[in-house]
Curated annotation (Swiss-Prot):
Renumbered residue ranges of the record's region Disordered: 1-26, 143-166
Protein name: Nucleolar protein 16
Statement: the UniProt record of this protein carries the keyword Iron: no
Compositionally skewed regions (Basic residues) per UniProt: 1-11
Biased composition (Acidic residues): 147-166
């Protein structure tokens, strides 16, 4: 090993030193959620693999569209060609421009040798003559009298698709969710004392309690006061 000046130069070198990679230093997934998931978690699998095995979704907002990757690759290729990064792609660029022109012509209508864009519901196109006067107004599909054969076909609903089988983990989680016990509100000693003061002062007069500026300082509504008094009376009956 060099020492002194040579060693300091090596330490300042921009060349990355070869170090030993240890898998034990990788971040391990710690399951802190439901005990049902924790018991069925396989440490040898990744998080995505475990979620797929259990029948869960890793991201609730993720979109999985068939052919999306192909569309993205096609857009990336189209952008690369349009930017002219490769000078040998001129023929391919011309071919793609020709295909775009053909698709545009298919999607447009032709009226009086003028291309009319494809109109949707609630849209219209005004045809003018050389003097700028309105000759014709072309409406969207909802206003057009003539419809294509595709529009005349009656919609019969979505095709029945086989639903994915629920895993055992999903069934257990659903059963637990059904048995989830509600946590009833327990009145504190301070709340009970406050309600008792209202009853001693106003009796059953809810309107008087509502307009009492000294006791009802937080302006609790009439319905809220009724619910609190009803719960207070039920608690006193159980304690008697």
């Amino acid at each position: 090993m060099p020492s002194g000046v040579r060693r300091r130069k090596m330490n300042r070198s921009s060349i990355t030193k070869v170090t030993r990679k240890d898998k034990d230093n990788h971040k391990r997934i710690v399951v802190t959620g439901s005990d049902i998931i924790r018991q069925r978690w396989d440490k040898n699998l990744s998080m995505a693999q475990n979620y797929k095995k259990l029948g869960l979704a890793t991201k609730t907002g993720s979109r999985k569209i068939r052919g999306l990757e192909e569309d993205l690759r096609e857009k990336s290729l189209r952008l690369t060609i349009q930017q002219g990064k490769n000078p040998h792609d001129q023929e391919l660029r011309d071919l793609m421009e020709q295909q775009e022109q053909e698709e545009l012509e298919k999607s447009n209508l032709v009226v009086n040798e003028r291309k009319i864009p494809k109109l949707g519901a609630g849209e219209a196109f005004i045809v003018r003559d050389d003097k700028g006067e309105v000759v014709e107004v072309i409406y969207g599909k909802d206003h057009q009298t003539g419809s294509d054969e595709e529009d005349e076909e009656e919609w019969t609903g979505f095709e029945d698709k086989p639903e994915e089988e629920e895993t055992e983990t999903i069934k257990i989680l659903q059963e637990r969710a059904k048995r989830a016990a509600s946590n009833p509100h327990v009145q504190s000693d301070r709340e009970q004392s406050w309600i008792e003061q209202l009853i001693n002062k106003h009796g059953d007069d809810i309107d008087g309690m509502f307009w009492d500026k000294e006791l009802n300082i937080y302006q609790q509504s009439r319905g809220d006061l009724k619910r609190r008094i009803k719960k207070w009376k039920q608690g006193n009956k159980r304690n008697q």
